[in-house]
Amino acid sequence: MRLGKPVPHYQEKFPVGTRVRVKSRQYLEGFRRDWKYHHPISTEQIEAAGVTDTVKGAAFYHGGDVLYTLSATPGTWHEVCLEAAS
């Protein structure tokens, strides 16, 4: 509890160890264009479009945005930029 209020429970969509795929280049370019807040994605991340990797870690930005690190693909990844690998 903080100031008499319970701490919100955040839940990531992709737990550590989950195989994920970075979404398409078109999606990532649109995200970079439209996203105006924390952790903008880089050109290096856009080059990783379509890559499959494993979730190394998940963290929560203030307000509940889920941010991931991947095992072999650099950058901090927004949950909406990833999808389950089939």
Predicted regions and their residues:
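Basic/aromatic-rich interaction segments and small domains that mediate binding to polyanionic partners
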Residues: 2-86
